[in-house]
Amino acid sequence: MEWLSGFLDQIIAFFQWIWDFFAQGIYDFVRDGLVVATKASMYAALQTLILLIDVSYTAARELIDSLGVPQMIRSMYAALPGPIAAGLAFFGVPQALNIIMGRGGDALLHALRAVHWEVIRVDQDPSRPQWLLQNLRRDPG
């Protein structure tokens, strides 16, 4: 008769496991699924943002270069009277214009590095450059 009580205990344990799954397990299962879906959507959003940053930077650079904006700014700045040019040079306006017009992408990368993020290029296919935004903080938390 001991085998019968062991068998009934196994049946009761099975039904208890099913009851626990319906009581708490479904919630945990759905929550874990939503966590995975949220991680995937955040990753996709970051990858899309990186792609859009690359596309918009390239488009803006080509537009600015085709319109001749840097040459026009240099010629207009050279036409300024001496005291005004000296005042602007004191406040660093020429350097700011040079950064904006010449190396805007580098300034963006330096700003990202300042907040411990880095954009790295991951090329598996040279015709389609891919970028990866990487956190530079190495702390486990």
UniProtKB/Swiss-Prot annotation:
InterPro entries: DUF2523. Its main location: virion. The keyword Aminoacyl-tRNA synthetase does not apply. Interacts with G3P; this interaction is required for proper integration of G3P and G6P into the virion. It is a multi-pass membrane protein. Signal peptide: none annotated. The gene is VI. Belongs to the inovirus G6P protein family. The chain crosses the membrane at residues 3-23, 33-53, 80-100. One of its GO terms (cellular component) is virion component. Plays essential roles both in the entry of the viral genome into the bacterial host and in budding process. The formation of the G3P-G6P complex termed adsorption complex is essential for correct termination of filamentous phage assembly. Coiled coil: none annotated. This is Head virion protein G6P. One of its GO terms (biological process) is symbiont entry into host cell. It comes from Pseudomonas phage Pf1 (Bacteriophage Pf1). Keywords: Host membrane, Membrane, Transmembrane, Transmembrane helix, Viral penetration into host cytoplasm, Viral penetration into host cytoplasm via pilus retraction, Virion, Virus entry into host cell. It is found in: Virion; Host membrane.
